[in-house]
From Swiss-Prot:
Natural source organism: Deinagkistrodon acutus
Alphabetical list of InterPro entries matching this protein: MetalloPept_cat_dom_sf, Peptidase_M12B, Peptidase_M12B_N, Reprolysin_adamalysin
Tissue specificity as recorded in UniProt: Expressed by the venom gland.
EC number: 3.4.24.-
Gene Ontology biological process terms, A to Z: proteolysis
Positions contributing to Ca(2+) 2 binding: V400, N403, L405, E407, D413
PROSITE patterns assigned to the protein according to its UniProt record, in alphabetical order: ADAM_MEPRO, ZINC_PROTEASE
Name recorded for this polypeptide: Snake venom metalloproteinase AaPA
Principal location: secreted
Amino-acid positions noted as binding Ca(2+) 1 in the UniProt annotation, renumbered to this chain: E196, D280, C385, N388
Subcellular location: Secreted
Protein function: Snake venom zinc metalloprotease that may activate prothrombin.
Length: 413
């Protein structure tokens, strides 16, 4: 039986109106300081897991009490999830971390049907939640020996660059066809698909994060946890099959030209990566500043193609969610989804994921057009690689010694 932990957190909130603070997401104004306090221990005799399957937190937002319900995202990793990095002498080192007891959750606010949440509970609470149409971010404050967290709206994060950023896909890349009305599209549970992806982190990212592989991994995990929620509306499960870090040098020529980099990355995947890790799609994450306003590029309607089921994404923001949405955008191109036009909608007042321009708004949803285009692409092309449902990590429990298994690429000392 799954152990369920009901944790009540009393968050005493003290708004700092007009003040600012430097957080991981940047300089933030108008935030609330909150102190999580666990009030309800586990039942007597219960065995506490490091990260429980279900958690609930109670706190106040703007003086109003809310209950945040979280459930572990058990489909986040594939059962054979692997991580790859390289030694200084060029050896490829493959490990299989034990990811069953991870700390990434999805959830909602109790009594708010439209609420959502994506939270990391690894070191305090970090992530975002939607409450009554407003999106809030939460993260631990950088105070020694303190449980203080900051809760704030994204609009209160000072923007380093106000210029609009864009996806590099243009009409020359996209094939425009008439879009069916939603009433013309038959949808059933048979349309559920499963996309196993590999994220490749280039050497510019390693430099940006000062070689801190743990920080890079956490950044990627949080991104994938965020986009799994967005893709659930398209009836597509996103599963992370692998993370490769080019720790010593790039294995392709990563250029400021997004188009050239995409081409090189696709060719490398077809001749190398696809033979090492079972996956359906690969995305390159880079700190390289692409030419012009471009922050991402992907082939359109290319899922399962060895060279073309790929995308490239610039790590363009200190706000994880914004980079995650860019990743979700490029992956959707691979699934036959085009840029939104004027008639497309994902709710009144919202900018949708497939907008060609990425601005400072918090984006979360695919539009009705994206939904229809994705369904049409799957119905027409039926890409075979995303048909199979992979086993979840919690279905396999193989005892091992240590935290990792090293494959043959690494010489044992």
């Amino acid at each position: 039986m799954i152990q369920v932990l009901l944790v009540t957190i009393c968050l005493a909130a003290f708004p700092y109106q007009g003040s600012s603070i430097i957080l991981e997401s940047g300089k933030v104004n108008d935030y609330e300081v909150v102190y999580p306090q666990r009030l309800a221990p586990l039942p007597e005799g219960a065995v506490q897991q490091k990260y429980e399957d279900t958690m609930q937190y109670e706190f106040k937002v703007n003086g109003e009490p809310v209950v945040l319900h979280l459930e572990k995202n058990k489909g986040l990793f594939s059962k054979d999830y692997s991580e790859i990095h390289y030694s200084p002498d060029g050896r490829r080192i493959t490990t299989h971390p034990l990811v069953e007891d991870h700390c990434y959750y999805r959830g909602h606010i109790r009594n708010d049907a439209d609420s959502t949440a994506s939270i990391s509970a690894c070191h305090g609470l970090k992530g975002h939640f939607k409450l009554r149409g407003e999106t809030y971010l939460i993260e631990p404050m950088k105070i020694s020996n303190s449980e203080a967290h900051a809760v704030y709206k994204y609009e209160n994060v000072e923007k380093e660059d106000e210029a609009h950023k864009m996806c590099g896909v243009t009409q020359n890349w996209e094939s425009y066809e008439p879009i069916k009305k939603a009433s013309q599209l038959i949808v059933s549970t048979e349309f559920q698909r499963y996309m196993e992806i590999v994220i490749v982190v280039d050497h510019s990212m390693v430099k940006k994060y000062n070689g801190d592989s743990d920080k890079i991994k956490a950044w990627v995990y949080e991104m994938i946890n965020t986009i799994t929620e967005s893709y659930s509306y398209l009836y597509i499960d996103i599963i992370l099959s692998g993370l490769e870090i080019w720790s010593e040098k790039d294995l392709i020529n990563v250029e400021t030209s997004a188009e050239n980099t995409l081409k090189s990355f696709g060719e490398w995947r077809a001749k190398d990566l696809i033979h090492r890790i079972s996956h359906d799609n690969a995305q390159l994450l880079t700190a390289t500043d692409f030419d012009g306003p471009t922050i991402g590029l992907a082939y359109v309607a290319s899922m399962c193609d060895p060279k073309r089921s790929v995308g490239v994404v610039q790590d363009h923001s200190s706000v994880n969610r914004l980079v995650a949405i860019t990743l979700a955008h490029e992956m959707a191109h691979n699934l036959g989804v085009r840029h939104d036009e004027g008639s497309c909608s994902c709710g009144s007042g919202y900018t949708c994921i497939m907008s060609p321009v990425i601005n400072s708004e918090v984006i979360k949803y695919f539009s009705d057009c994206s939904y229809i285009q994705c369904r049409e692409y799957i119905s027409k092309e039926n890409p075979p690689c995303i048909l199979n449902k992979p086993l979840r990590t919690d279905t396999v429990s193989t005892p091992v010694s240590g935290n990792e298994l090293l494959e043959a690429e690494k010489d044992y000392d």
